[in-house]
């Protein structure tokens, strides 16, 4: 991983994409020569904006930041650069207040690849699905990214919304497990037993005709959702899909 990160950093620099300056890498090997650990070393940088974690989860859209980010992402894709873990923490930035300019960087470089041609619309959208969680932030990013790529916002925005819903729904069980462990001290086997029961109720409800059984199952699901899933259903995608009562996003 460390060697791959260094080589990717060198290639990014050749494209003019900012990343902390690589210094080298080190590997720890066993007596038999097997790789046990590796370390990638870069020059230390202070980031005035840190990363995009706040923007990712909050509904407060910074238009200038979003436009600058979308332009940066479009440039990456136009160059055929695909970072496979394009999460908020992996795009730190520096903000120059005097010039009112953002400089974005890429970190955690071991999972990325370079292509001879820009990724397709579908591949580009999938590459952005984990970046922003809040629907308002996703909408703003989709609009700005479409404009930067010369695509129709009316096509890009709903595609990005659907991709983000799918990504966060896929992550929801793992996030909910962590929440149950943190909030209630619940063990993983206990949570999984409850979660599997919830899935059975949901499948049965989908098979049931409209009636008292369906209402009873939906009530059970809703109670489980409120207790364990809602806090991590960051886009309320599951609540909307299954029609669960929920607290609207702020």
Task: Go through the PLM ranges and name each one.
Residues 46, 88, 111:
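Short, glycine/acidic-enriched loop or turn micro-motifs at the edges of active sites
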Residues 62-66:
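Short alpha-helical scaffold element within the canonical Hanks-type protein kinase domain
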Residues 158-233:
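Non-catalytic N-terminal targeting/anchoring module and adjacent flexible stem/linker
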